[in-house]
Every structure is written in C-alpha cells, then in structure tokens.
C-alpha cells in the first residue's frame, strides 16, 4: 500500500468510525494483525484483488479525511503549543510573585495533555 503502516494506523485511530464495517475488518487484519492479502482473502471469502481494492479505498478515504478535517495536524500543532506554554510557565515559576499562577498554568497544561 502507499502510505507507511504507522501513518495508516494513526489515521485509522482518528477516523475509524467513518469507515464501513468491512473496511474496518480488513484494515484491522492487514495493519493490526499483520495478515497478508492472501490470508485476508481466504478468511473473508473474497479475492485477493478485492482485499487490495478495499484496503486501497480505505487508505484513500483516511488520507482524504485528514486532508479535509486535519484532526491529526491540529492535534500536533496543539501539542507543540502546549509545550511552549509549559516552558514559559516554568520560566515564570522562577519569579516568586508569579509562581502560583505558573503552577496553575502547568496543571492546566497537564490536564489538557491527558
């Protein structure tokens, strides 16, 4: 398939509910269970080409969802900004008068990350 397995797994985690049940099943067998196309075809009772086409369509859909919705990119930007906020709050914590507010900011950042 076109995109690496790690990227596909990440896309799947974000957008799994937007795939059909059949696409989910085949995707799970291929990417999570590490079945070959032939093994999946035998288990699903369809042709190897049918498995390939279904997986290719699922991959195309997942990539399209990310292009359109951008959830993964947004979350990556959010994580980077949270790190910047945490670093600035740690710097503020060194100022005695700002320490309580800095602590509150750091706790809020930690809650968001969880």
List where the protein language model places each region.
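C-terminal flanking helix
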Residues: 59-66
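Short, Lys/Arg-enriched N-terminal segment that forms or immediately precedes the first helix
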Residues: 3-15
